[in-house]
Amino acid sequence: MRLAVLTWNLYHGRAIPPAGRDLLPDFAAALAGWNWDLALLQEVPPWWPRELAHAAGAEQRLVMTSRNQLLPVRRLLAIRRPDLMRSGGGGCNAILARGTTIAEHRRLRLCRLPEQRWLHAIRLASGIWAANLHATAHDSARAAREAAQASAATLSWAAGAPAVLGGDFNLRRLELDGWDHAGGHDVDHIFVSGPAPTSQAHTLDHGSLSDHAPVMVTLEG
């Protein structure tokens, strides 16, 4: 089975330099225009995944992360002033799956403080598992522990089935037991257990959207 996997930190829906407006249509158009089967997304405004999935013709699952109290108020302010609100607008991580069916969704809280960090994963109808992580920033030891926890949990859920683990690990270099590094850029990585990359991972042209580059790799197996 051939599978194109994308990981992208959306920077809470912001741009560099600041755009001063709601960028949901821009991010949705970018994602819809790229040729992927799985998109692992971090720092996503919580009201975005459904719209992103609709634009891309995909299914979606999300896990709420931090700063989501009084979300309707946060949403209103973040839509009007995204560059002022930044992460204060609330956040989630999301997985989008295109051209297939999501059969199962699981999640695991990795820590509560200083911010909630979650692993979440989907099982596709084909049996492949795909897991999404955004690890703690500015604390390499904690980020490494969270990556190890995420690695072990995903392998346990997959129970020998092919699996993908990707996201923003907040580590430029790392190795995970039981996984092969399929590729990455800066702190964003994609690991595989079973499938093999058919070509080198590469970044996509994202213009001014986000402070992270989208990373894409095609897998087979």
Language-model features: where?
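Active-site metal-binding loops of divalent metal-dependent hydrolases
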Residues: W8-L10, V44, L133-A135, G167-F169, ...
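Active-site charged/polar residues at nucleotide-handling catalytic sites that mediate phosphoryl
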Residues: W34
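Extreme N-terminal starter segment of soluble prokaryotic enzymes
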Residues: M1-T7, I128
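Metal-dependent phosphoester-hydrolase catalytic domains
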Residues: T100-C111, A141, R145, A152-V164, ...
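Metal-dependent phosphoester/phosphodiester hydrolase catalytic core
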Residues: G127-I128, L133-A141
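Active-site neighborhood of phospho(di)ester-bond hydrolases with catalytic His/Asp-centered motifs
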Residues: A39-Q42, R61-V63, V164-D168, F191
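Acidic/histidine-rich helix-loop elements
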Residues: T7-L23, T136-S140
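Structured beta-strand-rich core segments of catalytic domains in phosphoester-bond hydrolases
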Residues: V44-G127
